[in-house]
Amino acid sequence: MKKKLTGASFGILGDSYSTFAGHITEGNNIYYPRPAAVDDVLNVEQTWWHLLMTRNNMRLLANDSFSGATICTDVRPGHVVANAYPARAERTFSGDIQPDYIFLFGGTNDNWLDKTIGQVQYGNWTEDDLKRTLPALCYVLDYLVKKNPQATIVVPINTGFKPELHEGMLEAAAHYGAVAICLADIDKKSGHPSALGMQQIAQQIAQQIEEALQ
């Protein structure tokens, strides 16, 4: 662990949970705000990352979150491979911005869409390997670590994942020296964090990072 949260800079590589209109990479799919589905997350200040940022006087350098995105490159209908996590990691975290923290928050769509989980794999990835979630996650972690050696990589793991996905994400995070955050009891509406859920995510991330610092 290289730096405490207080005053740190950070970037996000995420999915719908981390989107908010006007606050993500231009052209990315947006989920929040969506009052018809989540009626109480209406302002960017209510998102998990903005709460974390405000409470810890942090600076957001990039939020490359894309609603509906999978970690693996076997993307959902209507998406292209460039929407998946490997291509977006290369686009946004190639080493130019050098954040203190990178939050790699994903896997929810892989889990919902029953994508092939596969096994952890720490090198020699082929295009077919990246169509499976755990090899693709390892590829992304490997890229982030190599291009951003100054950064602490944080991997929040959503609730409700298949056990083999949850355990594989823990194993991959440990291999790459990332901090895995095991989220628990997150309040949701239509499968997405409510205002309370966003607060819970921010609190659990901060608490578990603090524990990892000790």
Question: Where do the PLM segments sit?
Answer:
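Short glycine-rich His-centered loop
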Residues: 1-42, 71
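Residue-level detector of flexible, active-site-proximal loop/helix-junction positions
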Residues: 17, 67-70, 160, 187
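Short, well-ordered coil/turn elements that cap or connect secondary structure elements
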Residues: 5, 55-56, 148, 175
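Conserved SGNH/GDSL esterase-like catalytic core that processes O-acyl groups on lipids
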Residues: 28-118, 126
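Alpha-helical cap/lid subdomain in secreted, periplasmic
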Residues: 81-214
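Residues at the starts of beta-strands that form the adenosine-phosphate
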Residues: 9, 60, 150-152
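Serine-centered coil/turn micro-motif
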Residues: 16, 46-47, 132
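Generic structural signal for helix capping and beta-alpha/helix-loop junctions
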Residues: 20, 70-73, 163, 190
